[in-house]
Amino acid sequence: MDWLDDVKWDAQGLVPVIAQEQGTGDVLMLAWMNREALRQTAALGRAVYFSRSRGKLWFKGEDSGHAQTVHEIRLDCDRDVLLLRVTQQGHQPGIACHTGRHSCFFSRLGDGAWQAVDAVLKDPRAIYG
Amino acid sequence: MDWLDDVKWDAQGLVPVIAQEQGTGDVLMLAWMNREALRQTAALGRAVYFSRSRGKLWFKGEDSGHAQTVHEIRLDCDRDVLLLRVTQQGHQPGIACHTGRHSCFFSRLGDGAWQAVDAVLKDPRAIYG
């Protein structure tokens, strides 16, 4: 498919992908996709990433139940970064982070240190237990 | 400085950085930082990236005038991605993209093709001329 060839995959065949929450505009996480992950994301309308640590496709929510419905897929001007507009499923408000928080970006720089400033919405042991 | 050591720099000494607009929540761009870029960003309160193509620090706005004032710096749960909350300077509405558009993510997937769906706000020749 031509549109998959338009993406500039890196040396590992990956691109970074930003997941932004529909409605709030909150940036939830950054993950990675390979060609097959992007193809499946577009086909299924749900986020499928490539797990670099596990070396395989990661159907977001397969363990946690916190899947992401994908409303829109965008590509940047250099064609090497993707932006998804998503609805985070399985909890209200949405939990994108494996720590049980809304967003993975819960640490803020202040007074020369990273400080966790966002609440844990659900105990990770209850998510993955 | 300890907080710089907390970041998990990749094999090239870099991390991806998402710039999100304060107020609108729009995702403007993704760029990269090395340790020195992050140190200067925090010290100056303006976005300083590392240009992978030029192999040196990139003081965002040095050519275009479209600098980014940084309100907040966040780190993700894996400590290998940064999120900036910024105000895009030099034009109203802000122009983050070298194509003269608000955001670098102006191409949307639809009908099996990437389609440019956001307007050019200023001719790039007028920005960089």
From Swiss-Prot, chains A, B:
GO terms for biological process: L-histidine biosynthetic process. NCBIfam families: PRK00051.1. Keywords: Amino-acid biosynthesis, Cytoplasm, Histidine biosynthesis, Hydrolase, Magnesium, Metal-binding, Zinc. Gene3D superfamilies: Phosphoribosyl-AMP cyclohydrolase. Zn(2+) binds at C77, C97, C104. The gene is hisI. Mg(2+) binds at D76, D78, D80. It catalyses: 1-(5-phospho-beta-D-ribosyl)-5'-AMP + H2O = 1-(5-phospho-beta-D-ribosyl)-5-[(5-phospho-beta-D-ribosylamino)methylideneamino]imidazole-4-carboxamide. This is Phosphoribosyl-AMP cyclohydrolase. Its main location: cytoplasm. Binds 1 Mg(2+) ion per subunit. Belongs to the PRA-CH family. The keyword Cytoplasm applies. Pfam families: PRA-CH. The keyword Protease does not apply. It is found in: Cytoplasm. It comes from Verminephrobacter eiseniae (strain EF01-2). GO terms for cellular component: cytoplasm.
